[in-house]
Amino acid sequence: MDLGSLISETRNPDTLDLDNLSTLDMVTKLNQQDTTVAGAVSRTLPQVAEAVDSAAATLLAGGRLIYIGAGTSGRLGVLDASECPPTFGIPHGVVIGLIAGGPAALVTSVEGAEDDEGLGISDLQAQNLSANDMVIGLAASGRTPYAIGALRYARQLGCRTAAISCNPHSPLALEAEIAISPLVGPEALTGSTRLKSGTAQKLVLNMISTGAMIKIGKVYQNLMVDMRASNVKLVDRARRMVCEATGCEVAQAESALQQAQYEVKTAILMILTDLTAEQAGQRLAMHGGFLRAALQGHSQQPQAHK
């Protein structure tokens, strides 16, 4: 492939004078470029929605969601995966981020790692990849061998697959069932895909992980009710979520949370149904962990739930 022909590698005619601008004019021009990213992502929403549904189906069936990429793309996948356990209360290892070169590549460049298709395959094999899992390949260019090899292997195993790249009809996209390609255009700094391309990938990853977690019952209304209250800030947030969802006072929220071992969903259900912590936990289990379903039809639901 002629790398110079990739949109992400071409020069941006609007930023040819970056080195000759005042600092304010320079950052203004960079910001103007960034404002185009959300629009580019919006044009991929049908494909993003498809990826959300696929990821949710994978997780509900007991499979894992695995991001794999190199450089900035790989780091973004690791970042998104690492945020899922504290935000949504899922175990570590349910959403996984893999980067070419391993953990060391998060802070330093590992030369040549992205050019090895076999390395992408072996990294997935090390995770005992199975057909129950979903693999999302990440590469701004869409031609990174590490990610392409990984997606090809995942598809051969029968995994659900998706690709996120910022060039149209890329080799990576052709390996995936779902191709998400936000076309952000040439970078402000030629070839520096950590800029608009990285921002676009982050926005898409945000939607995929958040959307999938909503669809598997980790969110009630717009509250992350499976959050782990692991520090002072999050304990306070847990109290506020219980108060906001039920209309109760802080003291009642704190009492319910203590009885529920700081499981927010359980505490909310206890207050709205007068169930004990054990009964509320059982009722949630009967409804697959979906709080709205557990509350459905109960006479004590507040107006917001009707």
From Swiss-Prot:
What switches on its expression?
Answer: Induced by MurNAc 6-phosphate that releases the repressor MurR from the DNA. Repressed by MurR in the absence of MurNAc 6-phosphate.
* Residues annotated as the enzyme's active site: 83, 114
GO molecular function (one): carbon-oxygen lyase activity
The record's section on InterPro entries has: Etherase_MurQ, Glucokinase_regulatory_CS, MURQ/GCKR, SIS_dom, SIS_dom_sf
Give me the reactions it catalyses.
Answer: N-acetyl-D-muramate 6-phosphate + H2O = N-acetyl-D-glucosamine 6-phosphate + (R)-lactate
Q: Name one Pfam family in it.
A: GKRP-like_C
Enzyme's top EC category: lyase
PROSITE patterns per the UniProt record, alphabetical: GCKR, SIS
- Single biological process term from Gene Ontology: N-acetylmuramic acid catabolic process
Q: What is its EC number?
A: 4.2.1.126
Q: Which key words tag this protein in UniProt? A: Carbohydrate metabolism, Lyase
Query: According to its UniProt record, in which pathway does this protein act?
Result: Amino-sugar metabolism; 1,6-anhydro-N-acetylmuramate degradation; Amino-sugar metabolism; N-acetylmuramate degradation; Cell wall biogenesis; peptidoglycan recycling
The SIS domain extends over 55-218
Q: Which family does it belong to?
A: Belongs to the GCKR-like family. MurNAc-6-P etherase subfamily.
What quaternary structure, including any partners, is listed in this protein's UniProt entry? Homodimer.
The UniProt function text for this chain reads: Specifically catalyzes the cleavage of the D-lactyl ether substituent of MurNAc 6-phosphate, producing GlcNAc 6-phosphate and D-lactate. Together with AnmK, is also required for the utilization of anhydro-N-acetylmuramic acid (anhMurNAc) either imported from the medium or derived from its own cell wall murein, and thus plays a role in cell wall recycling.
* Miscellaneous note of the record: A lyase-type mechanism (elimination/hydration) is suggested for the cleavage of the lactyl ether bond of MurNAc 6-phosphate, with the formation of an alpha,beta-unsaturated aldehyde intermediate with (E)-stereochemistry, followed by the syn addition of water to give product.
Q: What is this protein called?
A: N-acetylmuramic acid 6-phosphate etherase
- Species of the source: Erwinia tasmaniensis (strain DSM 17950 / CFBP 7177 / CIP 109463 / NCPPB 4357 / Et1/99)
* Gene from which this protein is expressed: murQ
